[in-house]
Design a protein with these regions (language model features):
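Recognition helix of helix-turn-helix/homeodomain-like DNA-binding domains
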Residues: 26-42, 65
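Conserved hydrophobic/aromatic packing and binding residues within compact polymer-binding modules
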Residues: 7, 21-22, 32-35, 62
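Short, basic-rich loop-to-helix N-cap that marks the start of a DNA-contacting helix
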Residues: 15-17, 23, 39-53, 69
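A short, Lys/Arg-rich alpha-helix, primarily the initiator
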Residues: 1-13
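Alpha-helix N-cap/N′ positions at the starts of helices
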Residues: 2, 27, 79-82
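Short, charged recognition helix plus adjacent turn
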Residues: 63-92
Length: 93
């Protein structure tokens, strides 16, 4: 399932109206409706994190639905890549 559809299903399941949810996120209901209908790309990290908190779901799961790694995993991955590159320079071929 895609990000918007996942959030919409969870929001409806919990009985949270679109207007209330958008207000809690700090965005317009029109914008959030487009996100939920997959007419907008998944929102910036901060909104994904807030949506997860409001819905009580794992932030990592929503980031996966958004097609992105969570911010902490991005920095971990960056460090792994940097370490790998350093090791390739040091180790004999």
């Amino acid at each position: 399932m895609a990000f918007g559809l996942t959030v919409r299903a969870k929001r409806i399941e919990q009985g949270i109206g679109l207007n209330d949810f958008a207000e809690r996120l700090g965005v317009s209901p029109a914008y959030w409706s487009r996100v939920e209908r997959e007419q907008e790309k998944p929102p910036r990290d901060e909104l994904v994190e807030r949506a997860a908190a409001i819905l009580g779901v794992r932030m990592d799961d929503l980031f996966v639905e958004a097609g992105r790694l969570p911010p902490d995993m991005r920095s971990d991955l960056r460090r792994v890549v940097q370490t790998y590159r350093r090791m390739r320079q040091i180790l004999p071929k």
